[in-house]
A protein has these predicted regions:
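Short, well-ordered alpha-helical microsegments
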Residues: 89-93, 111, 131
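General beta-strand structural signal in soluble alpha/beta enzymes
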Residues: 42-45, 83-84, 103-106
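Periplasmic-binding protein-like
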Residues: 76-86
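Glycine-rich, highly charged phosphate/nucleotide-binding loops
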Residues: 56-73
Length: 144
């Protein structure tokens, strides 16, 4: 099985940024520990990470475009599923409309897991915009 994991960041494209390499290495280590034998998980980024992607709508538009352009390669390249691994579950409906393979989203999955573990839960973020986005995702998922 081949799984396409799509980040909303530029990853190696931001080679001058130490945090992008740390993130990429951490994801690779985690995948080694959780992927079943015979499952090929490959992480893809977008062209580059726009400044303010977690704060500004204009920056998010660049992320949306990069994400869709990247993920559209998954099916033709033989991937069996797509996992979107960015906090805001960008382009939820669009990706499910455009692809015939399963598309799952990390925050949606995390919110549903939290519901199974406890009657209430909290989402912690590093700025006000993340709080607003988390609330919007909870509403979208029928949890608020």
């Amino acid at each position: 099985m081949k799984i396409w994991l799509q980040s909303g960041s530029g990853l190696s494209a931001n080679g001058g940024t130490p945090n992008s390499r740390l993130y990429e290495d951490a994801v690779a280590r985690r995948l080694e520990g959780v992927a079943r034998a015979g499952t090929d998980c490959v992480v893809f980024g977008i062209g580059s990470t726009p400044f303010g992607k977690d704060r500004y709508h204009a920056a998010k538009q660049k992320v949306f475009t990069g994400l869709i352009e990247s993920v559209l390669r998954a099916e033709p390249e033989g991937y069996d599923a797509v996992g979107v691994i960015n906090t805001f579950d960008h382009r939820y409906y669009e990706l499910r409309e455009l692809l015939r393979i399963p598309v799952v989203f990390i925050t949606e999955s995390t919110l549903y897991l939290a519901c199974q573990l406890a009657p209430t839960f909290a989402v912690i973020g590093h700025n006000w915009q993340i709080k607003l986005q988390a609330k919007e995702l909870a509403n979208h998922s029928g949890l608020a």
